[in-house]
Amino acid sequence: MEDWLQFPEPAPAIRHYVTAQSAGAVRNWLFLVAGLVFLMVIVGGATRLTESGLSIVEWKPITGVIPPLSDKDWAQAFEDYQQIPQYKELFPQMDLSGFKYIYAWEWGHRLLARLIGLVFFIPLVLFWLKNLLPPGVKPKLLLILALGALQGGVGWWMVSSGLVHRTEVAQERLAIHLIIAALIFASCIWVAGGLGSVQPIIIHEHKSRLRLESILLMVFTCLQIFLGGLVAGLRAGLVNNSWPLIDGVFIPSSATLWALDPWWINLLNNPLTVQFIHRMTAYVLFLIALTHLIDSFLNTEGKLKRGAIIVFLHIIVQIILGIATLILVEPPFNGAPHILLALGHQAVAMAVLAVVTLQTRRLLSS
């Protein structure tokens, strides 16, 4: 009978070697990845604004890291580009030197994507094997890894949309590509933000309301970034270049907003509608940030109050840049100055997402 009551020896517990120093290393690594993703978004924006995104018409995840090296290779790459509608309809006068310029942007964009993959994957494996990852972090890192793999496929899915029947990529695919990059960026910051030293969060009252405001800030910031991708893909920023009115009115007529049939197509394909929604979402985001600022001043102290100020100031700067990008399209601001302005608008959008992510994390973990 005694034999029946004997249980096998328990397996030895997995030993973790997580220290404040190792957690700090993981934190710094994730902030580095976030910084590279930030740079990636800016390079991607420049690639789009210079009309370079369709210059490489094939997807070779491994061998594609090597650019054309000989005159023969360059001639072949240029010939491949000459077969797509963008070259035939928009740039039939482009010569080989012009092609090399746009090729460099797209190749650099793809090279940076590969670099980010390595910078994320190799340290992840090392931290994992040495049991240096804090408890609960592994599933989050695997999710970020999955998002990165998905992003690679979505990038080619986006490019392929502009190779046959269009002279540019599909705007909805561009917006999806951008929002996935934003989610990877925010996820790295979210996880890294939880690995620092814990400081007390002081909230006198209305904690639930403050949390709701922070969640709304996250949701509307991500929505606004997605809408920004649609605006970019449709070139909707080049129509109705006035503010605060659109053709003399604050709200355009329903006949213009819903000109396409069925009605929901306007949400993706009507430049006026997309620009109008982008404007209105900016106003909503401003009001949420202002409400959060007031509530934080009345009910919090320390980091939360400072965080609310930083979020509000970032959104103010972003609105100013958005208005400037919209209205400054004539000389002397067209061309390179306007490209720099648009890239600044895109960069600050990511900065807004970063500070909103940190503020939301503080509130939800308090």
Segments predicted by a language model, with ranges:
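Polytopic transmembrane helical bundles with strong interfacial aromatic enrichment
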Residues: 2-366
